[in-house]
Regions:
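Conserved, structured C-terminal
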Residues: 1-183
Length: 183
């Protein structure tokens, strides 16, 4: 093909991947790629499920105005040793968040989706909410990431319940990521 492309070894799925940027009509490149053995087209739902399995936070879900990097367990990437940067003072005052990101794994086929409330078993007051959730094709179980109150003493193995369309569904807190491909 006589077409310029920008090929980036990037992605947001936890898998090896490439992003191809094309000026103009990408259809010939698309057809060439699909003709290769092992290449399958997929959509954004596939990308988002892989992101969730890899435990990667996404802005608008696990990151945003309501959640700091500390809430998303990303405090280690902030360099407070730098003299000054935009937001440094605000981040210094947010080192101890009220909510923190946890991984949840369930059983069966009922996945807790974004904004579903999370409860301690038998309790009526929500302790947080799901930020991302799906049925994991890789693990064959429902998984979710949730922002939960840090003052509840939750740890890996703790049991919680998700309100899935009016029914309490049991989940256990698990270590993130849910899945990491062997390299």
């Amino acid at each position: 093909l006589d077409q310029d492309v920008f090929l980036a070894r990037t992605g947001y799925t936890g898998e090896d991947g490439f992003e191809i940027f094309v000026a103009g009509d990408p259809s010939k490149i698309w057809q060439l790629l699909l003709a290769q053995d092992g290449v399958e087209p997929c959509g954004l739902a596939c990308r988002d499920t892989l992101r969730l399995e890899a435990g990667m936070p996404l802005y608008g879900h696990e990151l945003g105005i309501d959640y700091t990097p500390f809430s998303a367990n990303l405090g280690k990437v902030i360099r407070f040793d730098k003299d000054q940067f935009v937001g440094k003072q605000a981040l210094e005052s947010a080192k101890h968040p009220d909510y923190r990101l946890f991984g949840l794994a369930g059983q069966g086929r009922r996945a807790a989706r974004a904004d579903y409330e999370i409860f301690l078993p038998g309790e009526d007051v929500a302790i947080g909410k799901v930020t991302s959730g799906a049925l994991s094709p890789t693990l064959q179980e429902p998984i979710a990431m949730a922002m939960l109150q840090v003052d509840q003493g939750l740890e890996v193995g703790s049991e919680v319940e998700a309100d899935v369309r009016g029914t309490r569904v049991p989940y256990k807190i698990v270590q993130l990521p849910f899945y990491k491909r062997e390299r």
